[in-house]
Regions:
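Conserved catalytic network of the ASCE P-loop NTPase/AAA+ motor domain
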Residues: 27-31, 56-60, 101-102
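Short strand-turn motif at the edge of the Rossmann-like AdoMet-binding core
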Residues: 40-42, 69
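Small-molecule kinase domains that catalyze NTP-dependent phosphoryl transfer to phosphate-bearing small molecules
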Residues: 80-124
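Short catalytic-loop micro-motif centered on adjacent basic/acidic residues
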Residues: 36-40, 109-110
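Loop/turn-to-beta-strand initiation segments
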Residues: 32-38, 63
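Conserved phosphate-donor/acceptor-positioning beta-strand/loop module used by diverse small-molecule
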Residues: 58-77
Length: 128
């Protein structure tokens, strides 16, 4: 959302300008960094092709995670954020897409029962 909402200020729709910039950022990371992390809420209908391209670029050496969190837990976590006044329940209900997996090989679900430490441990173990 930083790239799309804050830097480019574009709507989250198919073909939005942030996809091209994300591709460039990831390609730069591929050339210059040991690890590349793309984090955010990405709708399959909009971003699936982008992630397929990135999977191809990295020759399948990717880890994909889906936070499988209920709407109620999402609201709870949102209420604890600094930005919790920017939008509320009404907007979140409109945006909510349960089980919107990217559908990439090896995509893993992270449940709301996992602690932050458990998630970090799992990701670190996966990239070793």
């Amino acid at each position: 959302d930083v790239v799309r909402r804050e830097m480019l200020r574009v709507k989250d729709k198919t073909g939005n300008l942030s996809i091209a910039l994300l591709k460039q950022l990831v390609a730069f990371g591929y050339q210059e960094c040991q690890y590349v992390i793309v984090e955010g809420i990405f709708q399959k209908a909009i971003y699936h092709s982008f992630f397929q391209e990135m999977n191809h670029l990295f020759e399948g050496n990717v880890q994909v995670y889906y936070f499988d969190i209920s709407f109620e837990e999402t609201l709870k976590r949102h209420s604890q954020r600094n930005k919790n006044q920017e939008f509320g329940v009404v907007e979140m209900k409109r945006w909510w897409l349960p089980e919107d997996y990217l559908g990439l090989a090896g995509e893993q679900r992270l449940s709301e029962q996992l602690s932050e430490k458990q998630i970090i441990r799992q990701i670190l173990a996966d990239i070793q």
